[in-house]
């Protein structure tokens, strides 16, 4: 007897949330038409089918990039309602804070149509220095020694106590300090940039850089920022302040510029890499339709491979601590030549040991500008302030004498989940966390859905339903 088949292949089971009411729902992971989808059903709002990946082999590869979890030194909240309603961090979480975000204001000198924080000139909150110091202390209590702390906003550079805040951060055990900025003050105030340079080493600018096109910038940022960005980069190049370009991506708007942004970044003295961040359906998302304009991590990865002159399919790989949401590629900048490194690294090197470290030793191939993976060292001592101070979940690179951080270029994809594609398996491994004023560390994905501003009042409603 011939029996009917499903139009898809069942892969796995997980928990998600309804995109409309945010209640927890069961979800299937399926393969259909060379793509990965999440099928979920809410008893109030019915079925949803969400695209998770456009690359089944890569999705399956992510399942292999797993490593033992690295824990914080304490937990901030108990387990009571279940993920994602207990943030955080609760004892059910599976990753410490690789990147801790401290928002020092919600005031901004732009009102971007796309902004997960909903910042604007109309907002009024400036956190005072004592509050911010307590937020730094929360990080240190959790981490003992923090890998990366990002000062964010709003626009942090317009905070009246900005440099005092940086001074307080530098007093603490923080390996790498980063400032997330739209670049306006950096472009217009060279004395400000000169003072920023005094915080090197272990200091970096995370510079908003979405497009080279006026219409795109108007849609994403509400203003043509091309001249501002160029002036900002000129100042950062002049003082050689390590910079990561961060591009928010919207399908059909600026995803065709991925290769151009990478190439331009490699040509700048100060730029150490580019981070691509597909829009998360959270906060202010004007003129954005998540049903047609959302980008998956796999689509961004495929565009990098397609558009970049440097990176091939083997060069952009999952980040072991959070493979569903992070992918990376390293390259070496030498004499104007870009040489990808990731494809020559055995994936087992990325997965072994408590702290991933890749050591490149000098040999004949190196002298010929070809680097060879030589050994694994779990407790490296680097002669320069370099890649070891970046996201701890990325492989660390010790380069031979005479080479430094400025010789390494990295591409990173950060795909934060939202009410459509949230998967509790992935949320539990989130390593990018917001610091709150009440001594909590909350994953980026869940913070913008449940915990930011007035959203927690609705979360309380969901929690009450669970314990009835």
What residue spans do the PLM features occupy?
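Short, solvent-exposed loop/turn segments at secondary-structure junctions
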Residues: 45, 212, 250-252, 281, ...
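Conserved alpha-helical substructure of the radical SAM core
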Residues: 34-58, 63-198
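Radical SAM enzyme [4Fe-4S]-AdoMet core and its adjacent flexible, acidic
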Residues: 220-226, 238-403
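A short, flexible beta-alpha/helix-coil linker loop
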Residues: 118-122, 212-215, 281-282
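Glycine-rich, histidine-containing beta strand-loop boundary motifs that form or position
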Residues: 104-106, 116-119, 153, 181, ...
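Radical SAM/AdoMet-radical enzyme domain recognition
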Residues: 133-150, 159-278
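Radical SAM enzyme core and accessory elements
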Residues: 1-81, 330-468
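Generic domain-boundary/flexible-linker signal
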Residues: 29, 53, 123-126, 160, ...
């Amino acid at each position: 007897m011939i029996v009917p088949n499903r139009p898809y292949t069942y892969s796995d089971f997980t928990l998600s949330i309804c995109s409309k009411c945010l209640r927890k729902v069961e979800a299937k992971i399926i393969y259909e038409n060379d793509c990965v989808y999440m099928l979920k059903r809410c008893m109030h709002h019915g079925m949803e089918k969400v695209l998770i990946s456009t690359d089944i082999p890569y999705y399956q590869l992510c399942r292999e990039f797993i490593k033992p979890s690295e824990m914080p030194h304490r937990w901030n909240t108990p387990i009571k309602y279940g993920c994602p309603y207990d943030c955080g961090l609760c004892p059910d979480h599976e990753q410490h804070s690789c990147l801790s975000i401290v928002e020092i204001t919600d005031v901004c000198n732009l009102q971007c149509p796309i902004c997960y924080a909903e910042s604007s000139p109309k907002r009024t909150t400036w956190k005072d220095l004592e509050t911010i110091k307590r937020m730094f202390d929360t990080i240190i209590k959790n981490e003992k020694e923090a890998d990366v702390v990002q000062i964010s906003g709003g626009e942090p550079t317009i905070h009246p106590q900005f440099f005092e805040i940086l001074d307080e951060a530098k007093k603490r055990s923080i390996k790498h300090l980063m400032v997330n900025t739209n670049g306006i003050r950096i472009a217009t105030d060279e004395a400000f940039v000169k003072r920023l340079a005094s915080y090197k080493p272990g200091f970096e600018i995370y510079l908003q850089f979405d497009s080279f096109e006026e219409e795109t910038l108007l849609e994403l940022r509400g203003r043509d920022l091309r001249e501002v960005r160029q002036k900002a980069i000129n100042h950062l190049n002049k003082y050689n302040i390590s910079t990561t370009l961060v591009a928010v991506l919207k399908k059909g708007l600026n995803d065709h510029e991925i290769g151009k942004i990478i190439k331009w970044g490699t040509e700048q003295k100060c730029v150490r890499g580019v981070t691509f961040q597909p829009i998360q359906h959270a906060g202010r998302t004007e003129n954005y339709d998540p049903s047609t304009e959302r980008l998956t991590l796999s689509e961004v990865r495929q565009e990098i491979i397609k558009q970049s002159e440097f990176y091939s399919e083997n060069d952009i790989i999952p980040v072991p601590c959070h493979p569903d949401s992070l992918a990376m590629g390293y390259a070496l900048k030498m004499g104007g030549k870009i040489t990808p490194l990731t494809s020559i690294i055995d994936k087992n090197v990325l997965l072994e040991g408590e702290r991933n470290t890749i050591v490149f030793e000098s040999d004949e191939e190196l002298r010929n500008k070809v680097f060879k993976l030589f050994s694994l060292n779990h407790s490296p001592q680097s002669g320069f302030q370099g890649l070891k101070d970046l996201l701890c979940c990325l492989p660390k690179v010790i380069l031979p004498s005479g080479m430094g951080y400025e010789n390494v270029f990295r591409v990173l994809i950060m795909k934060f989940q939202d009410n459509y594609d949230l998967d509790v398996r992935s949320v539990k491994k989130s390593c990018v966390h917001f610091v709150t004023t009440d001594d909590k560390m909350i994953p980026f994905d869940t913070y913008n859905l449940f915990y930011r501003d007035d959203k927690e009042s609705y979360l309380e409603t969901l929690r009450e339903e669970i314990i009835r």
